[in-house]
């Protein structure tokens, strides 16, 4: 594919995101690029995304290795992932442009479409996304929700020891403990994302939840649950109850949730006329600020650690300071390793 890179829209610690135009079709693309020697996770994301084909997953358009200027480092060998352009930004953007939250009718629509995307990657591809949240779900040209940012995703079969990755506020109890992370963890994150859409806020709020350590400990070891918004209908609360089961094996699957009364026969017409600033898409700076480097720990002693030490690892212990306030769209996902 021949394409021309446009304006730089955002930078993370390893990647730069630009708009681009395909010469042959004139299609606007989103291009995520990293220096080749630092592109391991971008290549992993490209490998996973290239295997997917669903209207509820952001579209893969290709990948390339080129020699070009990169940041202020002069000319460098660059790895680029080309993706579909989504004109209405993220669900977080949609909430912001609509007064800070999304009405329940559209929450139903978006939730159903997220689950259709998860049903596809879970059942047909054996993939867990591992970082479902509002800022990782885009709104496409026809108003449909599309799962994006597969940087934390992994294959769940066969079960291979993998780092636990994701955003602390959306982590399931088993992931918060650093034990495992699979399809069930995505379902927990769907519940948290519904709360985020309805309230316009992270699923954990209040003076007791001002840092990731507190939330990880209380979710992983004290068994606490996010508070359900009182404005929700009983059906919505029941739906969230099926997502936010403490035991992973008790959570409903994506397929089961698609048949829950909260979602059945309630999808409204596709949203049109959304207010947007150009360019607003998968290339938005808000979306791409979450591009980070993996933080790794030696796996050999993980299970020998006391639970307090394991929470320390989960809170970026060692060389990253945990801020006192949350930034859901910033540098707030973590990596831990286990045997």
From Swiss-Prot:
SUPFAM superfamilies assigned to the protein according to its UniProt record, in alphabetical order? Protein kinase-like (PK-like) (SSF56112)
Q: Name one GO molecular function term.
A: protein serine kinase activity
Q: Which UniProt keywords apply?
A: Abscisic acid signaling pathway, ATP-binding, Kinase, Nucleotide-binding, Nucleus, Phosphoprotein, Serine/threonine-protein kinase, Transferase
The reply to whether Cytoplasm figures as a keyword in the UniProt entry is: no
What is the annotated localization of this protein? Nucleus
Task: Report whether Transferase shows up as a keyword of the record.
Answer: yes
Q: Name one GO cellular component term.
A: nucleus
- What processing steps or modifications follow its translation? Autophosphorylated. Unstable protein degraded by the proteasome pathway; this degradation is promoted by ABI1, but blocked by ABA.
- Protein kinase domain sequence ranges: 3-263
Record PROSITE patterns: PROTEIN_KINASE_ATP, PROTEIN_KINASE_DOM, PROTEIN_KINASE_ST
At the top level of its lineage, which domain of life is listed? Eukaryota
Gene disruption: observed consequences: More vigorous root growth, decreased abaxial stomatal index and increased stomatal aperture. Reduced induction of RD29B and RAB18 expression in response to treatment with abscisic acid (ABA). In the double mutant map3k17 map3k18, impaired MPK7 activation mediated by ABA.
Question: What is catalyzed by this enzyme?
Answer: L-seryl-[protein] + ATP = O-phospho-L-seryl-[protein] + ADP + H(+); L-threonyl-[protein] + ATP = O-phospho-L-threonyl-[protein] + ADP + H(+)
Q: What does this protein do?
A: Component of the abscisic acid (ABA) signaling pathway that acts as ABA signal transducer in the context of abiotic stresses. Triggers MPK1, MPK2, MPK7 and MPK14 activation in a MKK3-dependent manner and MPK6 activation in a MKK3-independent manner. Mediates the ABA-dependent activation of the MKK3-MPK7 module. Positive regulator of ABA responses leading to the induction of gene expression (e.g. RD29B and RAB18) and involved in various responses including stomatal development, stomatal movement, inhibition of germination and root growth. Promotes leaf senescence.
Family statement drawn from the similarity comment of this UniProt entry? Belongs to the protein kinase superfamily. Ser/Thr protein kinase family.
Its assembly, as annotated, is: Interacts with ABI1. Binds to MKK3. Associates with SRK2E within the nucleus.
> What's the protein name?
Mitogen-activated protein kinase kinase kinase 18
Q: Which organism is it from?
A: Arabidopsis thaliana (Mouse-ear cress)
């Amino acid at each position: 594919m021949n394409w021309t890179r446009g304006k730089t829209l955002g930078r993370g610690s390893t990647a730069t995101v630009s708009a681009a135009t395909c010469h042959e079709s004139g299609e606007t693309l989103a291009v995520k690029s990293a220096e080749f020697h630092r592109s391991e996770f971008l290549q992993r994301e490209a490998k996973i995304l290239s295997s997917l084909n669903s209207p509820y997953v952001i579209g893969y358009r290709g990948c390339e290795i080129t020699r070009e200027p990169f940041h202020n480092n002069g000319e460098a060998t660059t790895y680029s992932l080309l993706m579909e352009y989504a004109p209405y930004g993220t669900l977080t953007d949609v909430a912001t442009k609509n007064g800070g939250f999304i009405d329940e009718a559209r929450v139903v629509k978006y939730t159903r479409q997220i689950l259709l995307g998860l049903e596809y990657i879970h059942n047909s591809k054996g993939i867990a996304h591992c970082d479902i949240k509002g800022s990782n779900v885009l709104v496409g040209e026809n108003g449909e929700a599309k799962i994006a940012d597969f940087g934390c995703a992994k294959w769940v079969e066969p079960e291979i020891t993998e780092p636990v990755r994701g955003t602390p506020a959306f982590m399931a109890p088993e992931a918060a403990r650093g034990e495992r992370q699979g399809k069930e963890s995505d379902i927990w994150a769907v519940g948290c994302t519904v709360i985020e859409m309805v309230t316009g806020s992270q699923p954990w709020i209040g003076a007791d939840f001002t840092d990731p350590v507190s939330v990880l400990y209380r979710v992983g070891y004290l068994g606490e649950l996010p508070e359900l918004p009182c404005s929700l209908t009983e059906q919505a609360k029941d739906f969230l109850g099926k997502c936010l089961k403490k035991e992973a094996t008790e959570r409903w699957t994506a397929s089961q949730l698609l048949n829950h009364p909260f979602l059945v026969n309630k999808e409204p017409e596709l949203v049109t006329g959304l207010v947007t600033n150009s360019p607003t898409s998968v290339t938005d700076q808000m979306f791409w600020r979450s591009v980070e480097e993996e933080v790794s720990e030696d796996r050999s002693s993980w299970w020998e650690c006391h639970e307090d030490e394991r929470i320390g690892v989960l809170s970026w212990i060692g060389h990253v300071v945990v801020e006192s306030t949350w930034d859901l769209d910033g540098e707030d996902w973590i990596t831990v390793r286990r045997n």
